[in-house]
């Protein structure tokens, strides 16, 4: 079947009332960005849905795949745009039926957005079903459990006919909900947390704490790859890599061993808080899950949060670990997340970390050294990378450079 349009259904944009135009415009921009590099199509965004007009050479499968990854899109259907005559509709219905298997069953489903169309829903179903049955003697109607369902939408401008409905990612268009800073560790949880807030229309930049030589270049490349996977859905993402060795060593030098984990995370939050103000973000996002590890109890979260007045969003707070793993696999980050490269959260881990840290104690331990200068130095020396969906890792770049130098 040669389709001439893609019908794109909006997600929660239908609930946005007077703000809908803003959301539709943002979604159109996101669609154009996602489809960059492809040709043979024209994007037409309307108030209640979007149409992608296809030329003969358009790569419909690639376009549909990319659209399915965009937040704010509920579903996509390859459609035939048909004139508003029963003759044109019947001819299109027969085209669909030509693709059916022998002895298969079908159903006609009609929706009439144009209530002035001269035929009602039942009449259209009967006429189109009858046209198919007259043309083929080896297929039949089954309205309850059909093998095929030809869907017909009668709209003001034309008739749209289709069979397939490809699920989209739902949610809201990224860019409509402000900016946040994602604390990206390299584990399973934080990429999922990032994906969850992006699904609510939020733009993200990511921050990663790197502690060489205790953490390797492979750990850094792992985080770059996770960012690249997230960028496949939303376009380029800035990744801020913080040199954290000095701070982490100093924490382990002056803080009681049972409190080093709490204090380390407080230092991370202080660095993140400064960066939030530099980039104009409105919140910090992390992958914390209540009770999962010692640093993620309510007592720990209270002690860690206390260093910032910036809102901290925890999309995975109440998830089961298995739920997070399932989502990680769905979004394509799981296999990268489980690569066995240590991050700064796993080095210097005390044997018996405190699970209910006393806030006054952690402040007392940290008070013996003025960390502010180290924190400012870490922020000043942040390495910022812009990660795109086709970003090459450091190793790949070095290999390509060696090849070019050799040639």
UniProtKB/Swiss-Prot annotation:
Pathway: Cofactor biosynthesis; thiamine diphosphate biosynthesis. It is an enzyme of class 2 (transferase). GO terms for biological process: thiamine biosynthetic process; thiamine diphosphate biosynthetic process; thiazole biosynthetic process; tRNA 4-thiouridine biosynthesis. Coiled coil: none annotated. GO terms for cellular component: cytosol. SUPFAM superfamilies: Adenine nucleotide alpha hydrolases-like, THUMP domain-like. It catalyses: [ThiI sulfur-carrier protein]-S-sulfanyl-L-cysteine + a uridine in tRNA + 2 reduced [2Fe-2S]-[ferredoxin] + ATP + H(+) = [ThiI sulfur-carrier protein]-L-cysteine + a 4-thiouridine in tRNA + 2 oxidized [2Fe-2S]-[ferredoxin] + AMP + diphosphate; [ThiS sulfur-carrier protein]-C-terminal Gly-Gly-AMP + S-sulfanyl-L-cysteinyl-[cysteine desulfurase] + AH2 = [ThiS sulfur-carrier protein]-C-terminal-Gly-aminoethanethioate + L-cysteinyl-[cysteine desulfurase] + A + AMP + 2 H(+). Keywords: ATP-binding, Cytoplasm, Nucleotide-binding, RNA-binding, Thiamine biosynthesis, Transferase, tRNA-binding. One of its GO terms (molecular function) is tRNA-uracil-4 sulfurtransferase activity. The keyword ATP-binding applies. It holds the Pfam family THUMP. Its main location: cytoplasm. Its EC number is 2.8.1.4. HAMAP family: ThiI (MF_00021). Catalyzes the ATP-dependent transfer of a sulfur to tRNA to produce 4-thiouridine in position 8 of tRNAs, which functions as a near-UV photosensor. Also catalyzes the transfer of sulfur to the sulfur carrier protein ThiS, forming ThiS-thiocarboxylate. This is a step in the synthesis of thiazole, in the thiamine biosynthesis pathway. The sulfur is donated as persulfide by IscS. This is Probable tRNA sulfurtransferase. The gene is thiI.
């Amino acid at each position: 079947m040669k389709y001439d349009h893609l019908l794109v259904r909006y997600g929660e944009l239908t609930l946005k009332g007077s703000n809908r135009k803003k959301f539709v415009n943002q979604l159109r921009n996101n669609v154009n960005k996602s489809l960059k590099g492809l040709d043979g199509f024209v994007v037409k965004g309307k108030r209640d849905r979007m149409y992608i007009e296809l030329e003969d050479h358009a790569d419909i499968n690639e376009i549909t795949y990319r659209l399915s990854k965009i937040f704010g899109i509920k579903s996509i259907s390859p459609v035939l745009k048909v004139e508003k005559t029963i003759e044109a509709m019947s001819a299109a219905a027969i085209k669909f039926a030509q693709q059916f298997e022998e002895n298969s069953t079908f159903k006609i489903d009609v929706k009439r957005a144009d209530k002035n169309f001269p035929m009602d829903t039942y009449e259209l179903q009967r006429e189109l079903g009858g046209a198919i049955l007259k043309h083929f003697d080896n297929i039949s109607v089954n309205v309850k459990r059909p093998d095929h369902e030809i869907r017909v939408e009668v709209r003001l401008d034309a008739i749209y006919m289709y069979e397939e409905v490809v699920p989209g990612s739902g949610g809201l268009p990224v860019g409509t909900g402000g900016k946040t800073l994602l604390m990206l560790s390299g584990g399973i949880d934080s990429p999922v947390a990032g994906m969850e807030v992006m699904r609510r229309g939020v733009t993200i930049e990511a921050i990663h704490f790197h502690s060489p030589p205790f953490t390797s270049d492979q750990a850094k490349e792992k985080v770059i790859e996770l960012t690249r996977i997230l960028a496949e859905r939303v376009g380029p993402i800035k990744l801020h890599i913080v040199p954290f060795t000095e701070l982490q060593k100093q924490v382990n030098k002056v803080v009681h061993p049972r409190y080093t984990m709490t204090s380390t995370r407080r230092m991370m939050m202080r660095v993140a808080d400064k960066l939030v103000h530099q980039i104009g973000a409105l919140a910090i996002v992390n992958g914390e899950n209540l009770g999962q590890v010692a640093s993620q109890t309510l007592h720990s979260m209270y002690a860690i949060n206390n260093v910032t007045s910036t809102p901290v969003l925890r999309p995975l707070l109440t998830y089961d670990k298995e739920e997070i793993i399932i989502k990680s696999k769905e979004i394509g980050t799981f296999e990268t997340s489980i690569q066995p490269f240590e991050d700064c959260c796993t080095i210097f881990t005390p044997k018996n970390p405190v699970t209910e840290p006393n806030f006054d104690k952690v402040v007392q331990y940290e008070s013996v050294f003025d960390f502010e200068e180290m924190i400012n130095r870490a922020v000043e020396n942040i390495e910022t990378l812009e990660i795109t969906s086709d970003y090459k890792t450091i190793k790949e770049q070095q290999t390509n450079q060696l090849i070019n130098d050799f040639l």
